[in-house]
């Protein structure tokens, strides 16, 4: 695992956690300049998903422990804020719930918070990885490639969203993602599903803000209310992580929930 730091260390710290199978630069590169105006910004690059090291993603809890140790060693055990994109929301939830470090503001970025028993997680992983791994590494089959190309060329709002979302996933970036192993992807996908983040999380001194993408459906709102005792639900009439695709608006909303003045 690597953690990349940007900006003035005297400013409040915010740590960003990428989504499933995402590369840190394509996931968050477009928001770093805006964040650095207000925050000492740190971006997590998970084991097995960083191009500067030869490593394997073992499990979600293994990565959480590494992050906890980093925060203890480098940041006196405290973060002002943490943002979790999709999968990253599970990391933020675990870090808060385990209480080995303290986070003032935990921000959940329209995470699906899917949970499954280990047997089902393994089954879903066995189904998904043969399709998803070639897609991420740029070796997708003709059929899968055509499906995504069709969705991105429909000429409507959904196709524009899909195009931008694919950029966050690294598609079209020109980056060779062959450094990501199938084992890392499998372990990340499976352990995220079968690692419980807990229920009704309520930690003194911590506020949990949820960027709820309304177009995902009401069942996700119910999941957030089950996971967190008293979440600050920030509702947007958007799709999964669509807010993050608009860098200026996203930075504005992050600052707003953290009580920091930022003008669009």
Where are these regions (language model features)?
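Active-site loop/oxyanion-hole signature of alpha/beta-hydrolase fold enzymes
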Residues: 42-81
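Short beta-strand immediately N-terminal to the catalytic nucleophile in serine-hydrolase-like folds
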Residues: 82-84, 109
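Conserved loop-alpha-helix segment in the C-terminal half of the alpha/beta-hydrolase fold
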Residues: 33, 207-241
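Flexible "cap/lid" loop of the alpha/beta hydrolase fold
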Residues: 97, 105-137
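Conserved serine/cysteine hydrolase catalytic core
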Residues: 179-223
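Gly/Ala-rich beta-loop-alpha elbow adjacent to hydrolase catalytic centers
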Residues: 84-92
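Catalytic active-site module of serine/aspartate enzymes centered on a nucleophile-bearing elbow/loop
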Residues: 229-264
């Amino acid at each position: 695992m690597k953690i990349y730091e940007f900006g003035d260390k005297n400013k409040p710290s915010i740590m960003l956690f990428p989504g499933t199978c995402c590369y840190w630069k394509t996931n968050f590169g477009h928001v770093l300049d805006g964040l650095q105006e207000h925050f000492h910004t740190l971006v997590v690059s998970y084991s097995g998903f960083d191009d500067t090291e030869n490593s394997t993603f073992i499990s979600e809890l293994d990565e959480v422990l590494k992050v906890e140790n980093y925060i203890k060693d480098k940041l006196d055990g405290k973060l002002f804020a943490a943002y979790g994109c999709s999968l990253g929301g599970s990391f933020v939830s675990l870090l808060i719930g385990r209480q080995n470090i303290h986070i003032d503001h935990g921000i959940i970025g329209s995470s699906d918070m899917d949970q499954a028993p280990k047997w089902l997680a393994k089954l879903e992983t066995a189904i998904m990885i043969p399709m998803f791994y070639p897609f991420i590494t740029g070796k997708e089959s003709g059929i899968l490639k055509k499906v995504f190309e069709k969705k991105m060329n429909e000429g409507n709002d959904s196709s524009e969203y899909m195009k931008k979302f694919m950029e966050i996933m690294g598609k079209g970036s020109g980056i060779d993602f062959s450094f990501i192993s199938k084992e890392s992807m499998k372990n990340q996908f499976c352990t995220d599903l079968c690692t419980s983040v807990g229920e009704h999380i309520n930690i003194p001194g911590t506020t949990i803000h949820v960027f709820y993408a309304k177009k995902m459906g009401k069942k996700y709102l119910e999941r957030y209310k089950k996971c967190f005792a008293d979440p600050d639900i920030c509702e947007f009439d958007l799709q999964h992580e669509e807010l993050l695709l608009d860098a200026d608006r996203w930075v504005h909303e992050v600052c707003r929930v953290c009580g920091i003045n930022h003008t669009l």
